[in-house]
Amino acid sequence: TQMGFLELLYMSDEESVLKSEVANKLNLTKTSITRATAQLEEMGLIQQMKSGTEIAIKRNYSRKEYYENAKGYLINPVQKVITIMRYEATFESFSAGETALSQESELNPPRIEERAIYKGEEVVDQLEIVDARSEDPDDCLKIQLWKYNPSYFAREGCVNPVSLACTFKGNEDERIEMSIEKLLEEL
């Protein structure tokens, strides 16, 4: 559902899209996209319209209102965080966590760079997990394993702002909260 939400979030206002196109783009089954759009419609966030034999969907709100109305339902996409040696990172990954936030705000970057990949990537099983406390932080990378593929909505090598904000759910750090507010002002 969150992937469907994000796909519509990043479209322009008033734009509609065929449900089948969203399913293809995001690699979702017909069942998954049907369930997702039904949930979004139930929440009053989108409408579904018949378009010939297809069904088109569009947001009921401007981008900002759409996000505001949904943010209570959005989940943290991070399943698990692992630490690996930097030289192992030969796969495509996206700037995430405090690393991504520091690129968009005044926040200082974390001691160990944070990146995101989809938990279902084949490479995940081959990664050797290390204990960051016994390694030089400069040689380490923190890898967030995401529940959905961050590549679908990534921009300029960085995870998308709304998903990034979701990764900090429950974080009490004021500097982070302020940086996220600033980041989301541009929605």
Region roles according to the model:
Residues N27-E42:
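Short amphipathic alpha-helical interaction segments
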Residues E15-V17, S32-I33, Q47:
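Short, structured loop/turn "capping" segments at alpha-beta junctions
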Residues T53-Y61:
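Minor-groove-contacting beta-hairpin "wing" of winged helix-turn-helix DNA-binding domains
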Residues D13-L26, T37:
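Short acidic, hydrophobic short linear motifs in intrinsically disordered regions
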Residues Q2-E15:
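Short amphipathic alpha-helical interface segments
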Residues E41-G52:
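A short, conserved structural fragment
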Residues K71-L187:
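Long, low-complexity, charge-rich intrinsically disordered regions
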